[in-house]
C-alpha cells in the first residue's frame, strides 16, 4: 500500500435502483430526472446520519459510515423515503470491512464484497453480511433472516448473507426463491421426459400388437392356388 493511502474500518453501503436499465432504454429524460430526485432526497439523509456520500455509479450509490448500526439505521430511513417516491425502488447492501481511502473513493476486497451482496437484497429491502448481522443480533430492535452463503464473483471467502425484516422491510428470500424455481424446472423436465418415454413405449406396444394380430389372421387362412388355363397356339402335327 502507498504511504499516502490510508486504510479504515468502515460500514460500506451500495444501493441500486430496480428497473433503472429498462427505464433508461425507454425514457432517458425520465431516468435522468429520477437520478436527480434520488440525489436531492437521499443525500441530506446520509449527511444527517454522518455518513459519507462517496460517489454515484450510474443509478447506484457508494456510501460509508463509521459503524454498522449507523449504516443500518440510515438505510432504513432511506428505504422509508424511497418507498414513498415513485420509481425510486431500491436494493441496498451493507457490509463492514477494511477500505483504502483514495481521494473521493475507496477500494479493497470488502468494497467488492458489498457490491456482490447487493443483488441478493429484495426490491425495497436491505441485505447485510454476517459481520453487520453480528452487530445487530443483541439489539431487539432489529430482526434478520438468513438467506444463504452464495458464491460471490471474485470473492474467495465465504460470506453469509442476511436480510433485515424488521421496520416494515420485505422478507423476500431471493436465494431460496431461485433454488425453488430451478427445482420446479428440474421436476418439469423429469415429468416431460418420462411422459415422452411412456408415449414412445405405448406406440411401440400398439404397433407390435397390430403386427401380431395381422400375422395370426394370415396364418388362419387356407392357402389357395390359382390355375390359369393354358392355350397352345403352336402348330399341330
Residue ranges of each PLM-predicted region?
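Intrinsically disordered, glycine/charged-rich C-terminal tails and inter-domain linkers
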Residues: 1, 124, 131-212
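Catalytic NTP-binding/metal-coordinating core of nucleotidyl cyclase/transferase enzymes
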Residues: 2-77, 81
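Catalytic beta-strand-to-alpha-helix segment of the class III nucleotidyl cyclase homology domain
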Residues: 3, 40, 62-158, 165
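Short loop/turn elements that form and flank the Walker-type P-loop nucleotide-binding site
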Residues: 6-8, 87-89, 220-221
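Structural motif
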Residues: 10-12, 89-91, 159, 225
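A short, flexible beta-alpha/helix-coil linker loop
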Residues: 19-20, 97-100, 231-235
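Short, solvent-exposed loop/turn segments at secondary-structure boundaries
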Residues: 24-27, 104-107, 237
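An acidic helix/loop motif centered on a single conserved Asp/Glu
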Residues: 210-237
